[in-house]
Amino acid sequence: MSQSYELTAEARERVGKGSARAIRRNGKIPAVIYGDKQPPLSITLPYKEVFLRIHAGGFRTTVATIDLNGEKIQVLPKDYQLDPVRGFAMHVDFLRVGKNTVVTVNVPVHFINDEKAPGIKRGGVLNIVRHEVEFTCPANAIPDFIEVDLTGLDIGDSVHISAVKLPEGIVPTITDRDFTIATVAAPAGLKSEGAEGGEAEAGQAEEGEE
């Protein structure tokens, strides 16, 4: 799990587009904290700190602490809006995290031991079907990533979620099938040779029929 961090917030009394624009002009960003059966809180946060956190990676999988007038609130960033043209952050939604909060998150997939995969050593290409996998898990136990071991994979082999060792309490949201994470595909040259070989065999068969 990524290292938690703290942001200092101020309560926001006014809401709406006009108020939000004024907040952003003052170097801050509007945000809201919701969930855990409590009323939503409208707040403002320092723009620079939030922007850096968003672009540092792992923003939506790291539990943070928001200090609101001395009250420490555990939260998980759930969504944020970026300006479509200039790319700056415009708004953030935070989920309030309680002791027993279970969340749904997208967790990145990391691949290891590609040098131990015969198919890749022979020139095969790792075709990544899912760069992230959606899981439900305790908010205080979100993994930074899951590891997929490629050891022993040959050309044509696939890795399914059932083959991935998951931390305790981490459950895929897709439960009705053993979905594919990645496959090892044949290199282009090998595919061409296979196609040519098939055509030659077909030609020989036709000659034999005559």
UniProtKB/Swiss-Prot annotation:
One of its GO terms (biological process) is translation. Keywords: Ribonucleoprotein, Ribosomal protein, RNA-binding, rRNA-binding. One of its GO terms (molecular function) is 5S rRNA binding. PANTHER family: RIBOSOMAL PROTEIN L25/GLN-TRNA SYNTHETASE, ANTI-CODON-BINDING DOMAIN-CONTAINING PROTEIN (PTHR33284), RIBOSOMAL PROTEIN L25_GLN-TRNA SYNTHETASE, ANTI-CODON-BINDING DOMAIN-CONTAINING PROTEIN (PTHR33284:SF1). The keyword RNA-binding applies. This is Large ribosomal subunit protein bL25. Residues 196-210 have a biased composition (Acidic residues). It comes from the Bacteria. GO terms for cellular component: cytosolic large ribosomal subunit. Belongs to the bacterial ribosomal protein bL25 family. CTC subfamily. It comes from Chelativorans sp. (strain BNC1). Part of the 50S ribosomal subunit; part of the 5S rRNA/L5/L18/L25 subcomplex. Contacts the 5S rRNA. Binds to the 5S rRNA independently of L5 and L18. It holds the Pfam family Ribosomal_L25p. The keyword RNA-binding applies. This is one of the proteins that binds to the 5S RNA in the ribosome where it forms part of the central protuberance. Residues 190-210 are annotated as: Disordered.
